UniProtKB/Swiss-Prot annotation:
Presence of keyword Isomerase: no
Primary subcellular site in the record, as a coarse category: membrane
Organism in which the protein naturally occurs: Paramecium octaurelia
Known function: Small GTPase which cycles between active GTP-bound and inactive GDP-bound states. In its active state, binds to a variety of effector proteins playing a key role in the regulation of endo-lysosomal trafficking. Governs early-to-late endosomal maturation, microtubule minus-end as well as plus-end directed endosomal migration and positioning, and endosome-lysosome transport through different protein-protein interaction cascades. Involved in lipophagy, a cytosolic lipase-independent autophagic pathway. Plays a role in phagocyte formation and acidification.
Protein name: Ras-related protein Rab-7a
GO molecular function, one term: G protein activity
Lipid-modified residues, S-geranylgeranyl cysteine kind: 205-206
Length: 206
């Protein structure tokens, strides 16, 4: 059997409404920021090509609604994900406290094959408002450590601080799952027509 590496990785972004999930995605994919976003209804996604280990792959980044009334739709969007990004707002302690419930919900509804080793990345957004900080970086680092040494970045969707580095690590985390999920194809067999010699007619007596 021959194997082929995946060319598309599905990334899910989760977090409370208002933490900046859409802004993060738009800053990374389009290098743009606006204050005019409306709350995401259901889910939406953007795609971006990125180099990982000297090969080009596509990240399909899903931005999901943070409102409770849409959480029942999660399973349909979470399944098949290669990495889950948990986002909170460093000026909003409640959004940080919600990380546990978002992580648990993803594991329950997304049903990854290996939940203990599934890659999560935590982003503390709105670093541009550091003077209004309510969640200390050390507290977030401790949370990540206690949940399996989850990768962690403080970022700003507004001024792009740490966005590129964070998503590079997100892409690598997604690709790390390939060893367990390689796509296998049957070995190719070439079929050729063999020339058939006409069989001699057998004579018979009437």
């Amino acid at each position: 059997m021959a194997s082929q590496k995946k060319q598309l990785f599905k990334i899910i972004i989760l977090g409370d409404s208002g933490v900046g999930k859409t802004s993060l995605m738009n800053q990374y994919v389009n290098a743009r920021f606006t204050q005019q976003y409306r709350a995401t209804v259901g889910a939406d996604f953007m795609a971006k090509e990125v180099m990982i280990d000297d090969r080009m792959v596509t990240l399909q980044i899903w931005d999901t609604a943070g409102q409770e009334r849409f959480q029942s739709l999660g399973g349909a969007f979470y399944r098949g994900a290669d990495c889950c990004v948990l986002v909170y707002d460093i000026t909003n302690p409640k959004s940080f406290d919600s990380l546990d419930s978002w992580r648990d919900e993803f594991l329950m509804q997304g049903q990854p094959k290996d939940p203990e080793h599934f890659p999560f990345v935590v982003l503390g957004n709105k670093l541009d408002k550091a003077t209004e900080r309510k969640v200390q970086e050390s507290k977030a680092q401790q949370w990540c450590k206690s949940h399996g040494n989850i990768q962690f970045f403080e970022v700003s969707a507004k001024d792009a601080t740490n966005i590129e580095q964070a998503f590079q690590d997100i892409a690598k985390a997604a690709a790390s799952q390939e060893k367990d999920e390689e796509i296998f194809f049957p070995t190719t067999v070439t079929l050729t027509k063999q020339s058939q010699k006409p069989q001699a007619k057998q004579g018979g007596c009437c």
